[in-house]
Design a protein with these regions (language model features):
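Acidic, proline/glycine-enriched N-terminal capping motif
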Residues: 1-142
Length: 142
């Protein structure tokens, strides 16, 4: 039986933030930034809804992530048209790898058991009128 799940997060993409360190008493503890934690929660909710009652897969998977970043409001009409036509590409933050990491981590124990199962990863970042991320996960066949 083959496995495939797709879902969409209709929110501006956010890259995974670096862990923060704080001294409490004589100990140093780490925590995930609130912005990252909140965004991962949105991803988890979308993934859970897409999975329904299905259990996480334990086989190797291929993941495709299609990132649409919103065109800045400050761009001129001409520049906006260039963004929508694809002649101007989104080379600014958030970084594509940090967005992917946020999604891969959030899908742990929901879509697959662990992101070490991801053998193939396709990530694309483009401009669009609204920010969103589309994800497809399927079994990886040789």
């Amino acid at each position: 039986m083959s496995f495939m799940v797709t879902f969409m997060v209709e929110a501006d993409p956010i890259g995974k933030g670096r862990p923060k360190f704080v001294r409490r008493g004589g100990f140093i503890t780490t925590y995930t930034p609130t912005k990252t934690r909140d965004y991962e929660s949105i991803i988890k909710d979308a993934a859970k809804q897409a999975m329904g009652s299905s259990e996480p897969v334990e086989t190797p998977v291929t993941v495709a992530i299609y990132i649409t970043v919103p065109i800045p409001a400050s761009y001129s009409k001409k520049r906006t048209e260039a963004c929508l036509s694809g002649s101007e590409r989104p080379t600014k933050k958030p970084d594509i790898d940090n967005i992917a990491k946020c999604f891969l981590d959030a899908m742990n124990e929901i879509v697959y058991m662990d992101d070490t199962q991801v053998l193939t990863l396709h990530v694309t970042k483009v401009y669009g009128t609204i920010g969103m991320v589309e994800v497809m996960v399927k079994e990886d066949f040789d």
